[in-house]
Amino acid sequence: MATNVGGAVDNSRRSISDNRHDPEKPAELPDTLSGSETERPQDANPEAALDQQASDAAKAHDEGPPDGGTAAWMVVLGAWCCSFCSPGWINSMGSFQEYYQREPLKDYSSSEIAWIPSLEIFFLFGLGPIVGIIFDRYGPRPLIIGGTIFHVFGLMMASLAKTYYQFLLSQGVCSAIGVACLYSPALACISTWFLKRRGAAMGIMATGSSVGGVIFPIMITRMIERNGYPWALRTAAFLILGLQVIACLTVRPRQKPVPKKLPAGRLAAPFTEPAFALLLAGIFILTYGMYIPIDYLPLSGLQEAHMSVNMSQYLVAIMNAASLFGRLGAGYGADIIGRWNMFIIACGVTGISNLAVWIPATKSSITIGYAIMFGFASGAFVSLVGALPVSVSPIPELGYRMGIVFLVISIPALTMAPIGGAILQHASNGWVSLKVFAGVMCLVGSAIILGSRMLYTEKRLIKAF
């Protein structure tokens, strides 16, 4: 992505200070923190110097994100398709877990089979820094094209799989790598087209994963019953391919990326900034509280609320449907009260609902009510978690810093299932202990992110940020 070229050290520091606390304007960092433009060895590479001068001239006439227009909303459309096909697909993995245990992998334990969806979630977020660096240098198109190929090819191979390692490699690795290349670039592109309406645009994009989380499980379950597992996967792969063609044609950054290597010092910079480090710590803790209900609510409904098997399976679809409205509402609310404020409030409400509603949910009606409340409140986590680093990151490092946040999310996403299982198995009152753990993680994570927000706003609590 295009960058601003700094002057002397004092000017660079002043630019960073001016932009750091503005919630409506990402900070801009110079390419170097020492030396002036005249000290660059431009003569060594005349073509690179001309490219840099052209980039500087384009930026000098840049009037900022348009916050609308045909091109901007077409980017949102393509990003919605990416969201539908990446986290929306991941949200359907429960359908495969049940089928694998019943048919092709019935000789394997549930914990062994669980590695397939766990790896998908891990790759979705864990490849974030690598995907981010590629995005910053070359833009979204190579990633989206490559991700589409990996995702579709992995699903086609999974439709032919017969053994455990074939399912693991095709769906848990190949398809998952493709998924990782789709979501982050689309999310980062939206931030270059929108500023004042960025929350709403990201909220609209995030509804794609909710719609996918509702459509894919129902489609896969019904097609396995009627047409068999292989054609269920192939049909899903063809649907994903069609939507990703739209994404390839519409998702593009507002400014042409300038390939350049990020200095090693800048790679480590996010971890040395107290406010950003607090943000990472808060998101790490918060993720545990967000993912435990998603994974364990159907089992809780079956064992505690004595729901039927069919009804307990529909709890995930109910959560995703409620999450759709939560993501839209959080996006529009973020443009009014600030992205950080909206995120912290919604995640705090999620923690309270885990403690106040999920713990006493021993009846079907209460469990369904909790699924709706949790889905609506947790929608802000999905729609706004990428907006937090965007609002405080230098534009040249946008993809990389967003990737770091996703990498932090990947660790709890990978370890959450065994931790939750251990709590259920070894705690004296397993379900209550698990629900308390989820609620406390949400509240503690929200409090830490509030601390990060206070550092960014110089301890001003009443401020749209």
Swiss-Prot record:
Induction: The fujikurins gene cluster is specifically expressed during rice infection. It is found in: Cell membrane. Its main location: membrane. Residues 1-66 are annotated as: Disordered. Residues 11-28 have a biased composition (Basic and acidic residues). Disulfide bonds: none annotated. GO terms for molecular function: transmembrane transporter activity. SUPFAM superfamilies: MFS general substrate transporter (SSF103473). The keyword Transmembrane helix applies. InterPro entries: MFS, MFS_dom, MFS_trans_sf, Proton-linked_MCT. The chain crosses the membrane at residues 70-90, 115-135, 142-162, 175-195, 200-220, 231-251, 274-294, 314-334, 342-362, 368-388, 404-424, 430-450. GO terms for cellular component: plasma membrane. Belongs to the major facilitator superfamily. Monocarboxylate porter (TC 2.A.1.13) family. Efflux pump that may be involved in the secretion of fujikurins. This is Fujikurins efflux protein FFUJ_12242. It comes from Gibberella fujikuroi (strain CBS 195.34 / IMI 58289 / NRRL A-6831).
